């Protein structure tokens, strides 16, 4: 937000709302055993909006939201990947990443396939919509931690490992890096939700986004190998001349 006063008021309102949850009197409501939440479903849905609002105050993903209007997964995926520079590494960003962790943890703990097939009965449309921003931010933050020249600090390493612990080692090794794996797993989960039409678009977009992240990594590796090739050739010539 360009208006500092408005941003401050929004942050204050969000903080007050979060604190109020602790003193809310629980309503008498029957919660299904299969539900991914323990309290009232309205609180569960409101938390998705809360996390999304917190993230939007830090990262502007308007380009991704605009791309959704055209229902072209390639355009949406390109907007996702091109938003890399908007996701910074900072102590404030770690708070947003914690919100992203809380979002993906629900799916990881209950099972990706289970959530994909039952979310329509337990979740509202707010969850896939709000999860879009959070997962874009999360995958780009993970990518930066994995590829930035600046080494991650202790807090970033702890967060990275906490996220990695949500998935088995075989899955991470299969997709190479955690950033592309999270994008692919989230895309596969959302793609199976058939109740809302927009989730199909989101799922395909995240899968393409995962390919872009892993493809960029392969391009960087090829570039490094190309730079090292002349050095090796010169070394071999020098040895031969000797």
Where are the model-predicted features located?
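Long, amphipathic alpha-helical regulatory blocks in the mid-to-C-terminal portion
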Residues: 1-181
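Intrinsically disordered, low-complexity regulatory regions with latent secondary structure
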Residues: 171-242
């Amino acid at each position: 937000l360009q208006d500092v006063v408005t941003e401050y008021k929004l942050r204050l309102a969000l903080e007050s709302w979060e604190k109020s949850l602790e003193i809310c009197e629980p309503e008498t409501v029957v919660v299904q055993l299969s539900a991914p939440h323990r309290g009232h479903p309205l609180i569960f849905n409101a938390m998705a909006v809360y996390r999304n609002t917190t993230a939007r105050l830090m990262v502007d993903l308007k380009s991704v939201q605009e791309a959704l209007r055209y229902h072209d997964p390639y355009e949406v995926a390109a907007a996702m990947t091109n938003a890399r520079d908007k996701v910074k590494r900072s102590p404030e960003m770690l708070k947003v990443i914690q919100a992203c962790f809380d979002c993906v943890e629900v799916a990881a703990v209950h099972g990706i396939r289970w959530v994909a097939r039952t979310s329509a009965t337990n979740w509202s449309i707010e969850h896939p919509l709000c999860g879009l921003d959070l997962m874009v931010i999360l995958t780009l933050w993970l990518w930066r931690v994995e590829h930035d020249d600046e080494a991650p600090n202790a807090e970033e390493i702890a967060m990275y490992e906490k996220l990695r612990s949500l998935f088995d080692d075989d899955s991470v090794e299969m997709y190479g890096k955690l950033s592309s794996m999270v994008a692919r797993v989230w895309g596969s989960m959302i793609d199976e939700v058939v109740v809302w039409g927009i989730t199909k678009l989101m799922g395909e977009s995240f899968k393409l986004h995962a390919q872009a992240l892993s493809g960029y990594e392969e391009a960087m590796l090829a570039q490094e190998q190309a730079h090292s090739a002349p050095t090796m050739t010169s070394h071999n010539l020098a040895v031969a001349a000797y």
